[in-house]
Each structure stands twice: as structure tokens, then as C-alpha cells.
Amino acid sequence: INFKDALFDSIKQCNNKCPFCFIDQQPNGKRKSLYVKDDDYRLSFLYGSYLTLTNLNKDDWNRISTQKLSPLFISIHATDPKTREQLLKNKKASQILDQIEWLEQNSIQIHAQIVVCPEINDGKILEKSIYDLAKFHKKSFKTVLSTAIVPVGLTKFRPENDGLIAISKEYARKIIQQVEKIQTSLQKSI
């Protein structure tokens, strides 16, 4: 049996307004499917698409738990509630640590991702986020399997006045040094 789509109903659309969203940074006039902003846990489980957990309803959480849909790929960006809320422009974004705790209690593993945006979620906020996520790796059940740190990608098609700063080579080196130092520290304690 072949199915037209992997999902039998429509894709769950993203209701966040992240200033760094790659969908919003594409040129106009391309095929419609390139402009679909999914935030669908089913696509995360099936294909490794990243989701934010802000768009899930009670039934979605229940299904993730009941069907043990694991691992999921989660866009974290910051564990600091105010910073994550600022980045996703969504009040529900501040609940990320409670949501990861719920995933842990339900034996769901994740791969985490942090998109580093200069002067927003770097420095001490980045360090706190990495260490917060590492706590979920140190336990007997490793909820957080990996944490990817990626630089914000900006195109010439992005909306004006998005408040983002492009990453220079020097800044990238500084972030790499910071993350490698944290990584070395965690490798000794995990």
C-alpha cells in the first residue's frame, strides 16, 4: 500500500513568530510547499523535523506518551523562560523545562537544538541552556540524547527590522570556544 502523504490529516502549522525562521527568509514566488511552517510532532518522529512543543494540545501530548513517539527533535533555543518566549514570540514557549520534565516522566527521548542569536540567547543564557539540558542526559534515563548548537542563518530575503545580528567569523570562533569548554566540562561529569 502506498499513501500520498505520511499524515492522514493536515500538517500541524506553527503559530510561533521566530525572527530567524528559515521559512520567512525565502524568496517569494516559489512553490507553496516551501512556505509551509510545520510544527508537527508526527513529522518530528517520522523524519527528524524540529518542533517547539508550543503548538501541542492535550490529545497530542497524550498520543506522544501512549505511542511512545521517541525520539523527538526539539527546537529549544533557550531554557530561560523569558528569552525563549522572546525568541518564539509565544507565551507557551516559557514552559520548555516543564515540558522536557514531562517527556522524561513519559520515557520520551529528544534531540535538542539551539539556534544561537547574538545578544539574545548567547553568553550566560547559552551556557545555562546547555547545562539545563545536560541535567536530562546525566540521569539513568537519558531524555536529552544530544544538543546541537547552530548559528543563526540569515538571508537577504528576511523581514526588515527582525532584531537579529549576523554572525561574524570572530563571533563564531568565540561561540565554538565557549561550547567546547562546556563540552569538555560535561564529558568529565557525564
Regions found by a protein language model. Give the residues of each.
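Positively charged, polyanion-binding regions of nucleic-acid-associated proteins
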Residues: 150
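Conserved Radical SAM active-site core
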Residues: 1-142, 153-174, 178-182
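Short helix-terminating capping/connector loops at secondary-structure junctions
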Residues: 139-144, 188-190
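Membrane-inserting hydrophobic helices used for pore formation or membrane fusion
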Residues: 176, 185, 189-190
